[in-house]
Design a protein with these regions (language model features):
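Transmembrane-helix motifs of polytopic, lipid-linked glycan transferases
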Residues: 113-133
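Start-transfer (signal-anchor) and selected internal transmembrane alpha helices
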Residues: 18, 22-50
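Transmembrane-helix signature of polytopic, membrane-embedded enzymes
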Residues: 126-146
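Aromatic- and kink-enriched transmembrane "portal" helix at the membrane-lumen/periplasm boundary
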Residues: 140-163
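Loop-to-helix entry region of an early transmembrane alpha helix in multi-pass inner-membrane enzymes
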Residues: 100-120
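Extracytoplasmic catalytic/substrate-binding loops of multi-pass membrane glycan-assembly enzymes
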Residues: 53-71, 80-93
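Cationic, low-complexity basic patches in intrinsically disordered or flexible, solvent-exposed regions
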Residues: 5-8, 13
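Membrane-interface transmembrane helices that cradle and orient dolichyl/undecaprenyl
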Residues: 167-178
Length: 179
């Protein structure tokens, strides 16, 4: 016998977004359903932060990350390579560790975690300050979908620039609200 639904799907037309939404849409319009995406975003970034802390050696002791780590630890100031000034923002947390006299493993752990915290901060600014859920979701999806390709190549400034771009785009779209 073939499978039959006990009730046919009831689709409603939503003129706001021009989408056909399933019959359960009214149930999704509750206070809890509005908090779930926010919670999911923060949970995902918390997991990414925990992963960055757990895999700090794999993330910081290879290739460019090790080279840049050596330079900012030895100099005690941000290591700006090839005019990539965005790298200074993620080197501030490990530099605080250097200035406080923390061990090498602690400084490298802070460096590994600071990359994820940068993206989490961009996500939080879009979500909570600018009230732009779409930009926040874009940052979240960008980080989750590219984590397989970029998780261990952490100091790629392009990824930081794209997260920052979402924040700046969100600010640009709201420029008339502030005038």
């Amino acid at each position: 016998s073939t499978f039959q639904h006990s009730q046919p799907f009831n689709f409603q037309y939503n003129s706001k977004s021009n989408l056909l939404l399933p019959y359960f849409y009214p149930m999704m319009n509750t206070a809890l359903s509005k908090k779930i995406p926010v919670l999911i975003g923060h949970v995902v970034f918390a997991i990414l932060t925990a992963m960055a802390a757990h895999f700090w050696q794999e993330r910081t002791l290879i290739l460019d990350a090790a080279f840049q780590s050596y330079h900012f630890i030895a100099a005690g100031q941000p290591a700006i390579m090839v005019e990539r000034f965005g790298a200074a923002s993620v080197q501030l947390l490990p530099l605080l560790g250097v200035w406080a006299g923390a061990s090498l493993s602690t400084v490298l752990l802070l460096y590994s975690v600071s990359i994820v915290l940068f993206h989490w901060l961009a996500f939080s600014i879009c979500l909570h300050v600018l009230k732009d859920k779409k930009a926040a979701l874009a940052i979240l999806l960008f980080n989750v979908l590219l984590v397989g390709d970029s998780f261990y190549w952490m100091q790629n400034e392009l990824l930081q620039a794209i997260s920052l771009l979402f924040v700046l785009w969100s600010i640009w779209l709201r420029r008339e609200d502030w005038s």
